[in-house]
Amino acid sequence: MVRIRLARGGHKKTPFYHIVITDSRSARDGRFIERVGFFSPIKFSNRTGLGLRVNLERVKYWLYKGASPSDRVLKLIKNL
């Protein structure tokens, strides 16, 4: 089953997440099919708001193909 989920990056105590298309059997930060965006939950002093960038065209394509988003990714996409 193909999933749309977050893969963690960044440093200790400063998380950064890639929004990836992956097989559900792969590890959280393991192999992925395609990277479709990123999410940074930490506010930085030099920019306003949270960092979120998503290629909605590719997300719609994968949803059409039957990919299921994780709860967190679904919440992020709905807020766009």
Swiss-Prot record:
GO cellular component, one term: cytoplasm
Gene Ontology molecular function: structural constituent of ribosome
GO BP field: translation
Coiled-coil regions listed in the entry: none
Span of the signal peptide: none
One Pfam family named in its UniProt record: Ribosomal_S16
Ribonucleoprotein in keyword set: yes
Record's keyword terms, sorted: Ribonucleoprotein, Ribosomal protein
Membrane-crossing segments per the record: none
Family: Belongs to the bacterial ribosomal protein bS16 family.
Record-given protein name: Small ribosomal subunit protein bS16
Source species: Blochmanniella pennsylvanica (strain BPEN)
Gene: rpsP
